[in-house]
Regions:
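P-loop/Walker A NTP-binding region and its immediately flanking N-terminal helices
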Residues: 1-152, 161-162, 170
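Extended, largely alpha-helical regulatory/partner-binding modules appended to the mid-to-C-terminal parts
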Residues: 48, 54, 59-60, 99, ...
Length: 261
């Protein structure tokens, strides 16, 4: 089974992380000066590099991916017992003397209040060899007492130009050529999420090949084609109600879930 493009092109170094120059600059300086924080809170929209940066920090520190890096989905491990199990595990030493252990908690806002409170003591006084990286799309739901014990880095939505540039680079490597109008629409549709853009780019090519059009994208996204939309607008202008209903009926028959914007 072929590896998904967003996984294949997940950044594995600071210089490859797209659209987060402020975060990269801060982490680069802290690594260089050997003064990384014991706990971080990465907040921002999905698909903008939060988990990728957490993994990059761990690998840059030489952490063994099996023994020294622990990723926890707080959405499904959000109870007090889950945090107690985490607290018990942090005292295990790293795989090599002097190495760090990195714990990445994704969707940390999903922790229950009881679990969050159970985590506070550990977060405040972690073992010297442990770094916590908490990630969230909803920082306003994270307890203030947790926020105050972390270095908070806010991730930005990625700009369309950077998304298009990345898609072009992936296309070049994969021998995929999709026209610029389609790439621009993919970037707009992704709303600043590079992961979403790469997924839509891959889906578009897998479905329609290099000759994909904007209307093909509309089909994938469940939206009405430009041609149909123009006919609807013209019919509204001429107050041709029967034609409007006819067009909408045809759209519903062919694509029941398609949206008229």
């Amino acid at each position: 089974m072929q590896e998904a493009l967003y996984r294949k092109y997940r950044p594995d170094s600071l210089k490859k992380l797209v659209g987060q120059s402020d975060a990269v600059t801060l982490i680069e300086k802290q690594i260089k000066n050997n003064n990384l924080s014991h706990a971080y809170l990465f907040s921002g929209p999905r698909g903008v590099g939060k988990t990728s940066l957490a993994r990059i920090i761990a690998t840059t520190l030489g952490c063994d991916p099996v023994f020294d890096i622990t990723e926890i989905d707080a959405a499904s491990h959000n109870k007090v017992d889950d945090i107690r199990e985490l607290n018990d595990s942090i005292n295990f030493i790293a795989s090599s003397p002097g190495k760090k252990r990195v714990f990445i908690l994704d969707e940390v806002h999903m922790l229950s209040n009881a679990a969050s409170n159970a985590f506070l003591k550990t977060l405040e006084e972690p073992p010297e060899h442990v770094i916590f990286i908490l990630a969230t799309t909803e920082p306003e739901r994270v307890l203030e007492t947790i926020k105050s014990r972390t270095t908070h880095i806010a991730f930005k939505r990625i700009g369309n130009d950077e998304i298009i540039s990345t898609l072009n680079e992936i296309g070049k490597n994969e021998k995929i050529k999709i026209n610029d109008d389609v790439l621009s629409y993919i970037a707009n549709q992704s709303d600043g999420s590079l992961r979403d853009a790469i997924n839509l780019f891959e889906q578009t090519h897998n479905t329609f090949g290099n000759k994909a059009t904007i209307d093909d994208l509309y089909s994938i996204l469940g939206k009405v084609s430009i041609a149909d939309l123009q006919q609807i607008i013209e019919s509204i202008n001429t107050q041709d109600t029967s034609k409007i209903l006819h067009i909408l009926s045809l759209i519903h028959i062919s694509e029941p879930t398609r949206q008229v914007l």
